Amino acid sequence: MSVDKIVLAYSGGLDTSVILKWLANEYECPVVAYSANIGQIEDWDAVKEKGMATGADKVIVSDLQKEFVEDYIFPAFRASAIYEGTYLLGTSLARPLISKEQVRIAHAEGANAVSHGATGKGNDQVRFELGYIGLDPSLQIIAPWRTWDLNSRTRLEEYAKQHNIPVPTTKKNPYSSDENLLHISFEGGILESPWNEPDPDMFKLTVSPEMAPDKPTYLEITFQNGDPIALDGVAMEPLELFRALNKVAGENAVGRLDLVENRFVGMKSRGVYETPGGTLLYHAHRDLETICLDREVMKIRDSLVPRYAELIYNGFWFSPERELLQMTMDTAQKTVSGVVRMKLYKGNCFSVGRKSDQSLYKEDFATFEADDVYDQGDATGFIRLNGLRLKINALQGK
């Protein structure tokens, strides 16, 4: 099938600018450059201007921030999603949303092909393309990094100069970074050695612990059915609330993470992340669950978290199994409503109080003082029955 029109996921950087020109030349068809605003700091007018100057038939910038928070970040946090026990999935959650909007634009513009700038080594190529396939398998997918011979930065710069594509003359960023409302990631450069400590000047969203306030910051987050709805008693829309969490957590050095993760494509990768608001929200939400979730429900939910997080990390957001797990996670959240008081201090994030009308914590049952609701003698039979199989095993072994 011939390629008649292409929608490119376009950032305005060197890679996707070269791809934009290359697609127009290689396929001799119109290319729509599409940029997703998911909270990154960017001069969108400059992105549009550069895209048109580089050969785009049209440049579209979609503001997806509200949708990102409400339909991607919050559902994942209701599920307490965390990959390999550490990573809060900042990049992984953004990719399916970018893909979804790209497919929508392809339909609106009458394009029969989509393209992206992800390399053949990373997870993002998988995430983008599984999104395309899951939403419209009829679209042709063009992944230049897997087919062309421009396989180094030097060759990209040479191609850019040959085709009058502006190349930044400022000092190059020594890291590869990805930024959105949930986080910013840093990879490559000196970080490729897992022994090298990150440069303190690298961080953008958080202050260093040494520079954080010398007094702790207290705040209260109100939840309803697992979603945050208010900060310090003030009701806010999801986007406004999440920005506020990012600000206060970043000011207190909360959310820095340095890890080595297992990529879906098979290799290990070292990444450094800043996830200020997400880290604060994750810990507050988990704490409220301790009083609102039934023990066995929590056990089942926690057993599903690794699978749920892995699906998102690997790019299966639009899969039936992720949707099934989401319904299960959301059902568990029907009782997770209340208020958590958090204490932030020099990179640390503590829960210091929690309350809920749906709390399963009852002081008259848990008290160490005398009570009239719990017969301690009942524990004798409970222990005897639970120890029966241990007794039988011990006797058998003699």
Swiss-Prot record:
ATP binds at A9, Y10, S11, G12, G13, L14, D15, T16, S17, A36, G117. L-aspartate binds at T119, N123, D124. One of its GO terms (molecular function) is ATP binding. It catalyses: L-citrulline + L-aspartate + ATP = 2-(N(omega)-L-arginino)succinate + AMP + diphosphate + H(+). Transmembrane segments: none annotated. It is found in: Cytoplasm. One of its GO terms (cellular component) is cytoplasm. L-citrulline binds at Y87, S92, N123, R127, S176, S185, E261, Y273. CDD domains: ASS. GO terms for biological process: argininosuccinate metabolic process; L-arginine biosynthetic process; urea cycle. Keywords: Amino-acid biosynthesis, Arginine biosynthesis, ATP-binding, Cytoplasm, Ligase, Nucleotide-binding. Pathway: Amino-acid biosynthesis; L-arginine biosynthesis; L-arginine from L-ornithine and carbamoyl phosphate: step 2/3. Its EC number is 6.3.4.5. It comes from the Bacteria. Homotetramer. PANTHER family: ARGININOSUCCINATE SYNTHASE. Belongs to the argininosuccinate synthase family. Type 1 subfamily. This is Argininosuccinate synthase. The lineage of its organism: Bacteria, Pseudomonadati, Thermodesulfobacteriota, Desulfobulbia, Desulfobulbales. The gene is argG.
